[in-house]
Amino acid sequence: LNYWIIGDGTNIILKNNLKGLVIKNNLKGISFYQNSMMAGAGELWDDIVTSSLDNNLYGLENLSGIPGSVGASPIQNIGAYGSEISDFVEYVETFNLKKGRYEVFSKSACNFSYRDSIFKKKPNLLITKICLNLSEKFKANTHYEALPKKVLDAREQRKNILSIRSQKLPNHKKIPNVGSFFKNPIISESKLKKLISDFPEIKSYSFDEKKYKVSAAWLIDKLDLK
């Protein structure tokens, strides 16, 4: 029997009807211990962002408004506006569908990278719960250029993030869409310098000590593909 396990289904477009069993991961539950937050895979991602703020734990503000479920978040290593979920993951709990047992992955074992993780390569693992390590003190992440550099508190930061998102993407509850699925190309410094010489207005960001991200949105606009 073929089966598909889905989260909230916000990134799914079906070409044809599925033949088999469709299972919605609806594992719920949010709990806290000191600065750790545990959330069931069936919770909505944005609900745990607001729940963290309600419990005076900080760090997830820049990930506000991302559609989808908690269980999907580490698979893609979701990120936005200078933050990624991998910045906060303590561990990911999974159920191995082939071996019939629970398996827990530490942050390092998740093999997180830019919009990637070990879970993309292991479809037999059903994510059941995640544990996030958050901060008891708010420190605004304002690396994204459009964000105000001075922020009063975490709720203002969240408000700013939601405002930016609303300008870039339609509300998926009113106009269904799969959001932004383009990855920013990662290139070497030498390639970036060549691009800057040809296109001085190009938008780029530091990725690590040797590589840079080029804005996919800028490239799409430049090629009139929007």
Provide a role label for each language-model segment:
Residues 102-226:
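Phosphate/pyrophosphate- and phosphate-bearing ligand-binding catalytic cores of soluble enzymes
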Residues 1-92, 96-98:
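Anion-binding (especially nucleotide phosphate/pyrophosphate-binding) glycine-rich loop
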